[in-house]
Design a protein with these regions (language model features):
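Active-site helix of classical SDR
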Residues: 121, 157
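Conserved glycine-rich cofactor-binding loop
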Residues: 11-13
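The beta1-alpha1 cofactor-binding region of Rossmann-like NAD(H)/NADP(H)-dependent oxidoreductases
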Residues: 58-71, 103
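Conserved glycine-rich Rossmann-like NAD(P)H-binding loop of the short-chain dehydrogenase/reductase
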Residues: 25-42
Length: 253
């Protein structure tokens, strides 16, 4: 029987790749994200390719707590049991010493990467507890392990994701719910373009001189982690580019 997979931040990059990977595996997917037009475009595209899977779309801004509650309730009413939740929505904004950081950028990262992730989990977790099964994937980052210059807030948010996942695993120990933190290194997506507020030239320098990870690499990892036997729980998975040793210790050609 096909599983029902909810993916936040599914309109591009890693989230979109995860959606495609689960559809290729034969699962049903729930796409959520802020860009309604992109959600509908993906739904149309997927419907033409994956004829036997169900695709639902729900516009969602994870920083809007009221919206999170409403949308999660609608998802449960429409889809039924959720087997896998992929908390992928997240972002970095800016790169500067903490004392010079833009307050709005800081708050947006905290609201999205931490509060939003926790809010979605809080709304969908009770149904998993009732069903005594489920798998929660929380998207962390190597930045949560290795802080680097100019990214104190982003690193802190991703460290929080890791710690939250560990606590959640403890709280659900008496159930068959699994919790995994995925911690990617440098992945070539629109991540840096978003971080630098649309500055494509600056974003491109992040990936120069190295073969960065691709969104598909992370998607394949997520599917692998959630495809293990019931007895196996992979708690953490760290994936870095071959030219990346730690955080921003990178060898560039």
């Amino acid at each position: 029987m096909a599983k029902n997979v909810v993916i936040t931040g599914a309109t591009s990059g890693i989230g979109e790749a995860i959606a495609r990977a689960y559809l290729e595996k034969g699962e049903n997917i729930v796409l959520t994200g802020r860009r309604t037009e992109r959600l509908e475009a993906l739904k149309t595209e997927f419907a033409e390719i994956f004829l036997n899977q169900k695709v639902w779309t729900f516009p969602l801004d994870v920083t809007d707590m009221s919206m999170v509650k409403t949308v999660c309730s609608d998802i449960l009413k429409t889809v039924g049991q959720i087997d896998i939740l992929v908390n992928n929505a997240g972002l970095a904004l800016g790169l500067a010493p903490y004392q010079d950081y833009e307050e709005l950028d800081m708050l947006t990262m905290l609201d999205t990467n931490v509060k939003g992730l926790m809010a979605v989990t809080r709304c969908l977790l009770p149904s998993m507890v009732t069903a005594n099964q489920g798998h929660i994937i929380n998207m962390g980052s190597t930045a949560g392990i290795y802080a680097y210059a100019g990214a104190a807030v982003y690193s802190a948010t991703k460290a929080a994701v890791k710690t939250f996942s560990d606590g959640l695993r403890i709280d659900t120990i008496a159930t068959d719910i699994k919790v995994t933190t995925i911690q990617p290194g440098i992945v070539e997506t629109d991540f840096s373009k978003v971080r630098f507020h649309g500055d494509e030239a600056r974003a491109a320098t992040v990936y120069q001189g190295l073969e960065a990870l691709q969104a598909q690499d992370i998607a394949d990892t997520v599917v692998y982690v959630t495809s293990q036997p019931r007895r196996v729980q992979i708690t953490d998975m760290t994936i870095m580019a071959n030219q990346q040793a730690t955080g921003f210790m990178i060898h560039r050609d």
